[in-house]
């Protein structure tokens, strides 16, 4: 929103100076909210008349769009004259024209984002009731699983809730904003503050394309040295995944994915319970974190459920992001060494090549760390 405000101010300043000079009239007071509503109405019209607005849209298309934007619709020139944005563009020198086009393009792109946020904002409100119902059911299932004393009892819980689990997974995997909606149930700031919504959207929105790519990458891992555990949980997952629409529509081998996930789970459990290096790393991290986090502050907050926990994390997000970042960066080399040793020991391959954990982690950090 701050960037949009700067772009809007630049647009208004250039426009007012030229309009007043050419007409001899004085501009009215500026009302940004009023004008943004006008732009939000204009953008779909411009896209229909000219073309879709993208970061790579050509300058001549932007200039064409200027012909359809009349200044008399905006607060600072309301009903004064029939001048269009292109008439101001025509009065500028070449350097000014280039800057004006860039400003107008970026402003339209930011308005486009605002339209998307408004739409999501509306849907978040509408979907809250369903999300609350789903969340309660999920918590209930987890509670029953934790209370199960045998594998058969836990399997029965999963079987009894089979239809709900499949329908919920289909909803989650078909809606890139589903995770965001679940968070909105517990953190009301997403409903009341659009800037917070935009920040969370960048962090928690996951596209179907990204999911499919990630699932394929995991499926293609070769972990043949780890024995497959065909327990009842794995059998349940294997029966369930073929019914997931994302797997059906993208021709993903559900059995292969389930097998790899089972092996990864077995491997992680084994490392957590028997790998001395992993144990030392976790202990050192916990001890180091204790010196940076105020336990008293957490106690005073009175965290007693998921909602209060998410609110606490949201309110202290910057502080904990800094702590996590410092902890990770100070231990990155150690983490990579431990993971590479595990990969080497179990001969884990992708595309017939041994996984290079340093390349993988550094690439991920460089591409996606800005989100976190």
UniProtKB/Swiss-Prot annotation:
A GO cellular component annotation in the UniProt record: virion component
Pfam families in UniProt: Pox_A6
Subcellular location: Host cytoplasm; Virion
Keyword Protease (UniProt): no
InterPro entries in the cross-refs: Poxvirus_A6 (IPR007008)
Record keywords: Host cytoplasm, Virion
Protein task: Lipid-bound viral membrane assembly protein that plays an essential role in immature virion (IV) to mature virion (MV) transition. Functions in both crescent-shaped viral membranes formation and its enclosure to form immature virions. In addition, participates in targeting mature virion proteins to sites of virion assembly to ensure their correct localization.
Protein family according to the UniProt entry: Belongs to the orthopoxvirus OPG132 family.
Recorded domain comment: The N-terminal domain is not required for crescent formation but is required for virion formation.
Name of the protein: Virion morphogenesis protein OPG132
Organism of origin: Monkeypox virus
């Amino acid at each position: 929103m701050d960037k949009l405000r700067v772009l809007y101010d630049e647009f208004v300043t250039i426009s007012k100076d030229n309009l007043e000079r050419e007409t001899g009239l004085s501009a009215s007071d500026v009302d940004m909210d009023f004008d943004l509503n006008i732009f939000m109405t204009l953008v779909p019209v411009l896209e229909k008349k000219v073309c879709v607005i993208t970061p790579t849209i050509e300058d001549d298309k932007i200039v064409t769009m200027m012909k359809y934007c009349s200044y008399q619709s905006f607060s600072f020139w309301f009903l004064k004259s029939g001048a269009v944005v292109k008439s101001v563009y025509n009065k500028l020198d070449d350097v000014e024209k280039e800057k004006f086009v860039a400003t107008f393009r970026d402003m339209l792109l930011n308005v486009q984002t605002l339209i998307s946020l408004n739409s999501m904002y509306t849907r978040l409100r509408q979907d809250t009731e369903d999300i609350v119902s789903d969340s309660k059911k999920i918590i209930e299932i987890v509670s029953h699983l934790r209370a199960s004393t045998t594998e058969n009892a836990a399997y029965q819980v999963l079987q009894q809730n089979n239809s709900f689990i499949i329908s919920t997974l289909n909803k989650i995997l078909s809606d890139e904003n589903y995770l965001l909606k679940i968070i909105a149930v517990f953190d009301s700031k997403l409903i009341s503050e659009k800037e917070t919504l935009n920040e969370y959207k960048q962090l928690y929105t996951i596209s179907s394309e990204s999911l499919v790519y990630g699932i394929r990458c995991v499926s293609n891992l070769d972990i043949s040295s780890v024995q497959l555990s065909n327990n009842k949980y794995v059998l349940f997952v294997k029966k369930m995944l073929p019914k997931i629409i994302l797997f059906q529509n993208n021709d993903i081998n559900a059995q292969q994915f389930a097998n790899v996930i089972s092996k990864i789970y077995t491997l992680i459990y084994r490392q957590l319970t028997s790998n001395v290096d992993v144990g030392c790393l976790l202990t050192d991290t916990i001890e180091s974190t204790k010196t940076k986090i105020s336990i008293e502050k957490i106690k005073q907050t009175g965290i007693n459920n998921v909602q209060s926990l998410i609110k606490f994390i949201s309110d202290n997000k910057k502080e904990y992001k800094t702590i996590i970042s410092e902890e990770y960066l100070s231990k990155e080399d150690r983490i990579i060494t431990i993971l590479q040793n595990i990969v080497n020991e179990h001969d884990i391959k992708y595309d017939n090549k041994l996984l290079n954990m340093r390349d993988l982690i550094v690439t991920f950090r460089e591409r996606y760390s800005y989100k976190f």
